[in-house]
C-alpha cells in the first residue's frame, strides 16, 4: 500500500539545503522515474519495489510491440520509396524515431530491475538517444499535422516544388533541434553510485534547478507546443471535412480525431504528474514523503502510458489506414515469390497508384 505520511511532514530548511547541494537526479524522461538521488530522507521502499516489478515487464513488452509494429510500417513505406509523399517521409522518420526509442527500453529495464551496469558512456548515449527520439516523435507529428493542414484547408503543397530538398531540410531541422535538446544528456548524465541505495544508476549530476529546468523544457517543447499545433491544424481540417461531400470524409474525420486523441491520452497523464513534481520543486506544493511516494509511482505508470504511443503509432497511422493492409500483403507476397522464384522486378505504376498520398488523405496510412 502507499506510504501514509502526515501532510505536516514538510521539508525543513536543512532538508532543502541538503537537496540542492547533493542532488543527483535520475534520468527523468520516464524510463527511470524513482528518485535514486540523494533526496530528502523519505522511505522509498514502495516506489522502488514497484519500479523493479512493473517497469522491466512493461519495457520488455513495449520493446517487442514497438519494434515489430514500427518495423512493419518502415518496411511498407520503404517498399514504396520511389513514390513517397512528404507525409510518407515524415511517417518513415517517425517509425525510425519510435524504433530508436524502444531500443533503449531494455537498458532502462535492467536499470530499474537492478542497477546500471553499462558504464557512463552508454548511459550518456542511451539517455540522449531516448531524449532525441522522444522529441522527434512529437515534432514529426506536428509536421504531419501542418502538412495536412496546408493540403486540405488551403489546398497548398509546400513540398510540391523540389519536394525531396524541402522535406529533407525539414527533417534535418527537426533532428537538429532534437539533438540540441539532448545536449544536457551528453553533458550531465553519468553512471553514479548511490551510497544510500548501494547501487549504480544512470542519473543526472547537477543542482535541483537544472532538473526543474529540463522538466519545464520537456513539458513545453515536447508536449504542449506539438499538441497545440496538432489541435489547431486538425480543428481546421475537421471544419473543412464537415462541409465536404462523399463517404471518405467520415473515414478521414475518424482518423483525424484518433490522431489528436491518442497523442493527448498517452502523454497528458504523464505531463500532469511532471507538472505536480515541478510545483513541488519550486515550492508551490509542499513536498512530503507521502506525496513524493505517490508522485514517483504515478510517474512510472503514466510514463508507461506515454511509451505506449510508440506502439500505437503503427495502428493509428497504418493499420487503420485505407491501403496499409493491402500494401503489407503485397509486400509479403513479393517476398514469398522472391524466395521461390528469385528476384523479380516490381510492376511499374503511376505515382498516384503507388504513392501513399491521395488528394484528401496524406497517405496509404490514412492521415
Swiss-Prot record:
Q: Where in the cell is it found?
A: Cell membrane
Name the GO terms of the biological process aspect: angiogenesis; calcium-mediated signaling; cell chemotaxis; cell surface receptor signaling pathway; G protein-coupled receptor signaling pathway; immune response; inflammatory response; negative regulation of execution phase of apoptosis
An example of a GO molecular function for this protein is: C-X-C chemokine receptor activity
Sorted UniProt keywords: Angiogenesis, Cell membrane, Chemotaxis, Disulfide bond, G-protein coupled receptor, Glycoprotein, Membrane, Receptor, Sulfation, Transducer, Transmembrane, Transmembrane helix
Membrane topology (Extracellular): 1-56, 111-125, 190-222, 277-300
Q: What's one Pfam family here?
A: 7tm_1
Q: Annotated region Disordered: where?
A: 339-367
* Chain positions found as Sulfotyrosine: 27, 29
**Disulfide cysteine pairs (residue numbers):** 123-202
One of the record's GO cellular component terms: cell surface
Tree of life domain: Eukaryota
Recount the PTM note.
Answer: Sulfation on Tyr-27 and Tyr-29 is essential for CXCL10 binding. N-glycosylated.
Q: Which InterPro entries match?
A: CCR1-9-like, Chemokine_CXCR3, Chemokine_rcpt, GPCR_Rhodpsn, GPCR_Rhodpsn_7TM
Q: Which residues lie on this side of the membrane: Cytoplasmic?
A: 78-89, 147-168, 244-255, 322-367
The topology of this chain with respect to the membrane is: Multi-pass membrane protein
- Transmembrane ranges, per UniProt, are 57-77, 90-110, 126-146, 169-189, 223-243, 256-276, 301-321
Q: Which positions are glycosylated? A: 22, 32, 198
* Subunit structure, interactors included: Homomer. Forms heteromers with ACKR4. Interacts with PF4/CXCL4.
- Which function does this protein serve? Receptor for the C-X-C chemokine CXCL9, CXCL10 and CXCL11 and mediates the proliferation, survival and angiogenic activity of mesangial cells through a heterotrimeric G-protein signaling pathway. Probably promotes cell chemotaxis response. Binds to CCL21. Upon activation by PF4, induces activated T-lymphocytes migration mediated via downstream Ras/extracellular signal-regulated kinase (ERK) signaling.
Report the PANTHER family cross-referenced here: C-X-C CHEMOKINE RECEPTOR TYPE 3, CELL ADHESION MOLECULE
Write the protein's name. C-X-C chemokine receptor type 3
Q: Which organism is it from?
A: Rattus norvegicus
Q: Gene that codes for this?
A: Cxcr3
Amino acid at each position: 500500500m502507499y506510504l501514509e505520511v502526515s501532510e505536516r511532514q514538510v521539508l525543513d530548511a536543512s532538508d532543502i539545503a541538503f537537496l540542492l547541494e547533493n542532488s543527483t537526479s535520475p534520468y527523468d524522461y520516464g524510463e527511470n522515474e524513482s528518485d535514486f538521488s540523494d533526496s530528502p530522507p523519505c522511505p522509498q521502499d514502495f516506489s522502488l519495489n514497484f519500479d523493479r516489478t512493473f517497469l522491466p515487464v512493461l519495457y520488455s513488452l513495449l520493446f517487442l510491440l514497438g519494434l515489430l509494429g514500427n518495423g512493419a510500417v518502415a518496411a511498407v513505406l520503404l517498399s514504396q520509396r520511389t513514390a513517397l509523399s512528404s507525409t510518407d517521409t515524415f511517417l518513415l522518420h517517425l517509425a525510425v524515431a519510435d524504433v530508436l526509442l524502444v531500443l533503449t527500453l531494455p537498458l532502462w529495464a535492467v536499470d530499474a530491475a537492478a542497477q546500471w551496469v553499462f558504464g557512463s558512456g552508454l548511459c550518456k548515449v542511451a539517455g540522449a538517444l531516448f531524449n532525441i527520439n522522444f522529441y522527434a516523435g512529437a515534432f514529426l507529428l506536428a509536421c504531419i499535422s501542418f502538412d495536412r493542414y496546408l493540403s486540405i484547408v488551403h489546398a497548398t503543397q509546400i513540398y510540391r516544388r523540389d519536394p525531396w530538398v524541402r522535406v529533407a531540410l525539414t527533417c534535418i531541422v527537426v533532428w537538429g533541434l532534437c539533438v540540441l535538446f539532448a545536449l544536457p544528456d551528453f553533458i550531465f548524465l553519468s553512471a553514479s553510485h548511490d551510497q544510500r541505495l548501494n547501487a549504480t544508476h544512470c542519473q543526472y549530476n547537477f543542482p535541483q534547478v537544472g532538473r526543474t529546468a529540463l522538466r519545464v523544457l520537456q513539458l513545453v517543447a515536447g508536449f504542449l507546443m506539438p499538441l497545440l499545433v496538432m489541435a489547431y491544424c486538425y480543428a481546421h481540417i475537421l471544419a473543412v471535412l464537415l462541409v465536404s461531400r462523399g463517404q471518405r470524409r467520415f473515414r478521414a474525420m475518424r482518423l483525424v480525431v484518433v490522431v489528436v486523441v491518442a497523442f493527448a491520452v498517452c502523454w497528458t497523464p504523464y505531463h500532469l504528474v511532471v507538472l505536480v513534481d515541478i510545483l513541488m520543486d519550486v515550492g508551490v506544493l509542499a513536498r512530503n514523503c507521502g506525496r513524493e511516494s505517490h508522485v514517483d509511482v504515478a510517474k512510472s505508470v503514466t510514463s508507461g502510458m506515454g511509451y505506449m504511443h510508440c506502439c500505437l503509432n503503427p495502428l493509428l497511422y497504418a493499420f487503420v489506414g485505407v491501403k496499409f493492409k493491402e500494401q503489407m500483403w503485397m509486400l509479403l507476397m513479393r517476398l514469398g515469390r522472391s524466395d521461390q522464384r528469385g528476384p523479380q522486378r516490381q510492376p511499374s505504376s503511376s505515382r498516384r497508384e503507388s504513392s501513399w498520398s491521395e488528394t484528401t488523405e496524406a497517405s496509404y496510412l490514412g492521415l
